[in-house]
Curated annotation (Swiss-Prot):
Application notes: A miniplasmid containing this and downstream gene tubZ is able to replicate in B.thuringiensis subsp. israelensis and express insect toxin proteins. The miniplasmid could be used to make plasmids for insect toxin overexpression.
Additional detail: The pBtoxis plasmid encodes all the major endotoxin proteins (Cyt1Aa, Cry4Aa, Cry4Ba, and Cry11Aa) responsible for the mosquito larvicidal activity of strain 4Q2.
Quaternary structure annotation from Swiss-Prot or TrEMBL: Homodimer. Binds to tubC DNA, the TubR-DNA complex binds to TubZ.
Induction: Probably part of the tubR-tubZ operon.
InterPro entries listed in its UniProt record: WH-like_DNA-bd_sf (IPR036388), WH_DNA-bd_sf (IPR036390)
Protein name per its UniProtKB record: DNA-binding transcriptional repressor TubR
Domain text: Although this has the same function as TubR of B.cereus strain ATCC 10987 there is little sequence homology and the dimerization interface is different.
Originating species: Bacillus thuringiensis subsp. israelensis
Function statement: A DNA-binding protein that is part of the type III plasmid partition system used to ensure correct segregation of the pBtoxis plasmid. Cooperatively binds to the centromere-like site (tubC), which may seed filament formation by the TubZ polymerizing GTPase, stabilizing TubZ filaments. TubR-tubC complexes track the depolymerizing minus end of the filament, probably pulling plasmid within the cell. Required for plasmid replication. Negatively regulates levels of TubZ; its effect on RNA expression has not been shown.
Gene Ontology BP terms: plasmid partitioning
Keyword RNA-binding among UniProt keywords: no
Length: 104
């Protein structure tokens, strides 16, 4: 098995696990705007968008940051988050799965 194939399988598995957790899925997808593009948000904005408790959203954002699914940028004393390249690949897996489901 070549390295790219192994990497693709791991991304698909990660996407499936996130997709099975409603909170994790909502937090990750909050970073995608209505045009399907990645957007920058702070943790409070994510919590308000998806209407989940701040502690839950903050913990999920922190875990995604530690896992490398989102990137953090300091703006003054605040931190802004956006999808990393890995996070974008996971979202692409969600989109691909949705298209497959529509074609069934």
């Amino acid at each position: 098995m070549n390295r790219d194939h192994f990497y693709t399988l791991n991304i698909a598995e990660i996407a499936e696990r996130i997709g099975n957790d409603d909170c994790a899925y909502q937090v990750l997808m909050a970073f995608i705007n209505e045009n399907g593009e990645a957007q920058m948000l702070n943790k409070t904005a994510v919590a308000e968008m998806i209407q989940l408790s701040k502690p839950t959203v903050f913990a999920t954002v922190n875990s995604f940051y530690c896992a490398g699914y989102i990137d953090e940028t300091r703006v003054g004393r605040s931190k802004i988050y956006t999808l990393s390249d890995l996070g974008v690949e996971i979202v692409e897996c969600f989109k691909q799965k949705a298209m497959e489901m529509r074609n069934l």
